[in-house]
Amino acid sequence: MTNAVQTHMPAARAKPKKAIQGEKLRGYDKVARIPIKIIPTVEAKKKPDWIRVKLSSPAEVARIKSTLREQKLYTVCEEAACPNLPQCFADGTATFMIMGDICTRRCPFCDVGHGRPNELDKDEPRHTAETIQGLGLKYAVITSVDRDDLKDGGAAHFVEVLNESRALSPNCLIEILVPDFRGRMDIALDLLTETAPDVFNHNIETVPRLYKAFRPGSDYQHSLDLLKIYKERRPDIATKCGFMVGLGETEEEIYKLLDDLKAHNVDMITVGQYLQPSKDHAPVDRYVHPDEFQRYMDYGKKIGFFNIWAGPMVRSSYFADRQYYGEDCPAPIRSKKALAAEGKLGC
């Protein structure tokens, strides 16, 4: 007698919605048209014990959100569903996302909405500056959606935000996390060389072999060149780059990626675990053990990065001020039971 194997074909889905100006496409509607199709996840991998965040103050989280809504501002913390949001907001920090909340790219790892963005908000630079001042920030991170619809990719808007913020908070350090400005690199670098941040950050996201699947519309070498050329123009400004693990890369590919970043004049590195925002996004290939993250940090220090933070919950702007000042990466939060099972619990 043989056992019948029952297979279930995915139910037919409606055609994905078309992009309409000002409307965000998320989940299936966002990723349905990328070159390498995403098969919806039926059962997600169980998260290990080291995927944890600290409990936070609900009152402080509510205060930050209220301030942001009053100023009509967005944060990548909220739009990208960052798991560290409660901890960072409770600590009085947030990463401002300028140029709206609609991205012109369709990266299947990211939860930021895709579509046809609205025109830039001319008041956003002032509102951002007022919020930085109102929160009393000493270190601010400003990022953006990709704006392939703009001739300069939004670089001039970054400059306006920098100028307005420094006028109101001259002692606040500002890190900008920029898109790749593909097709617009020269004009963008001209603008951001003249009006420079304290840290120039651009995320390369993954290893080159996985670019077609996870970064459609982007180019690995272009991102490396962006970082290198900026550092050549402004050697006095710290450069920074982040990427994810758990997408299907190998450990050897990560070491090669770190070598590439070092060869392209990057000073600081962040490495974090990819977490799937929804069943329609790219699935998690594996959960990387904290010991592997430690090997990446050890290697990064060996080849000469000023600082490298690598850990399950590390994100590009995670305690960015601490990394800038040279502090070591916080250890992941783990249960005593799990540590004991691995023989790592002291007497």
UniProtKB/Swiss-Prot annotation:
Sites binding [4Fe-4S] cluster 1 sit at C77, C82, C88, S317
- Does the keyword Transmembrane belong to this entry? no
Gene Ontology molecular function: any one: 4 iron, 4 sulfur cluster binding
Q: Which free-text remark accompanies the cofactor?
A: Binds 2 [4Fe-4S] clusters per subunit. One cluster is coordinated with 3 cysteines and an exchangeable S-adenosyl-L-methionine.
* Compartment annotation: Cytoplasm
Q: Name one GO cellular component term.
A: cytoplasm
Q: What's the domain of life for this entry?
A: Bacteria
Q: What keywords tag this UniProt record? A: 4Fe-4S, Cytoplasm, Iron, Iron-sulfur, Metal-binding, S-adenosyl-L-methionine, Transferase
- Which pathway does the UniProt entry assign to this protein? Protein modification; protein lipoylation via endogenous pathway; protein N(6)-(lipoyl)lysine from octanoyl-[acyl-carrier-protein]: step 2/2
Q: Which reaction does it catalyse?
A: [[Fe-S] cluster scaffold protein carrying a second [4Fe-4S](2+) cluster] + N(6)-octanoyl-L-lysyl-[protein] + 2 oxidized [2Fe-2S]-[ferredoxin] + 2 S-adenosyl-L-methionine + 4 H(+) = [[Fe-S] cluster scaffold protein] + N(6)-[(R)-dihydrolipoyl]-L-lysyl-[protein] + 4 Fe(3+) + 2 hydrogen sulfide + 2 5'-deoxyadenosine + 2 L-methionine + 2 reduced [2Fe-2S]-[ferredoxin]
Please list the residue ranges annotated as the Radical SAM core domain. Answer: 89-306
Q: Where [4Fe-4S] cluster 2 is bound, by residue? A: C103, C107, C110
Which residue pairs form cystines in this protein? none
- SUPFAM superfamilies per UniProt: Radical SAM enzymes (SSF102114)
Entry's HAMAP family?
A: Lipoyl_synth (MF_00206)
NCBIfam families attached here?
lipA, PRK05481.1, PRK12928.1
**PANTHER family, per the entry:** LIPOYL SYNTHASE, LIPOYL SYNTHASE, MITOCHONDRIAL
- Specify the protein name: Lipoyl synthase
Q: Report the source organism.
A: Psychrobacter arcticus (strain DSM 17307 / VKM B-2377 / 273-4)
